[in-house]
Amino acid sequence: MICRNLQRFAAVRTLVLAALLATGLLGSTPIPLLAQASGTWTNTGSPNTARTAHTATLLGTGQVLIAGGSSSAGLLASAELYNPVTGKWTVTGSMATSRNSHTATPLPNGEVLVAGGNTAANSTATAELYNPSTGTWKTTGSMTVPRVLHGATLLPNGQVLVAGGTDATTDAELYDPSKGTWTTTGSLPNFHLVALAMLQNGRALAVDESDSSYTPGQLYDSSRRQWTPTTQMYYSHASVSTALLTNGNLLVYGNKFSCYAAEFYNPSANTWARTQRQCSNAISYGPLTLLGTGKVLLAGNAIMYGGKSFPTTNCALYDPSTNSWTLTGSLKQAAHHTLTRLLNGQVLAVGTDAELYTP
């Protein structure tokens, strides 16, 4: 099925580009192909369970925790650990609740907080803590409302900020690890599907990923427990991924276009700027991760056309110094991966298989 979809996508892309040229939307000059950069993917040990809609979290030990998600058999409560030294996976303790589309946030004490997601019955407000020392999970306080496809990020004070979700209220909430409880905080206006990211100035930035409007981002100040809008964004976004650049800017990617349509936020100036826009070898959405070189790796999950999603193995690198994208080695399999940068600088992609990227 993946091969047939990829063939269909290639044919569709040719027709799309031809149509755009014919209408003059891309101008009369040929579309520049993205340059090929170094970087390759290699297979590593296969997970015990192939999964999607899971979370991947780098632990202090250097191992990667994969939790929950969905398989061909349904929702998963299982979790496993990847050891970069051996390239092998080992099963660890299972969560109390099977879930996908949840969040996983590493805490300062080394534990990992998993919150929300879809369950067999409906969305959930439950949360659990993973202890790497014992390889076990324990339940903790539940959120004030169920959340799916929400955002979560660790604040400088050690609390976890959660916002958005498909059926959540506009209220954001805070998890206090010392008490194991949640409390509501400032309301996030008109945001439901939310991507959250921490900035170097200690504020959290929320991006609306409902693809409904060119909504300004929202900044959360933990000292005041308030949200304030940023300036207007250039694009409407969907399936958002973010990466904090070494210069302090935040790269935002994810759209329903068949082009590289990304932008970055400059906290110092409170402004948004667009990256180079190109429409060849496109990626509509996929995870981002910052490399040790200062560049950002984008691993393609899909390209959108006509309201439909087509799988892709395309990968690209964003270079902040030139504000441009270049192609890099393609994934071996289109599998809706997560991306995790390892301590050795390589990047682990996990979906229905596992691969390693060497910059």
Name every feature range the model reports, one short phrase each.
Residues I2-C3, T14, L20-P359:
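Kelch-like beta-propeller repeat domains
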Residues Q7-L15:
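N-terminal Sec-pathway targeting helices
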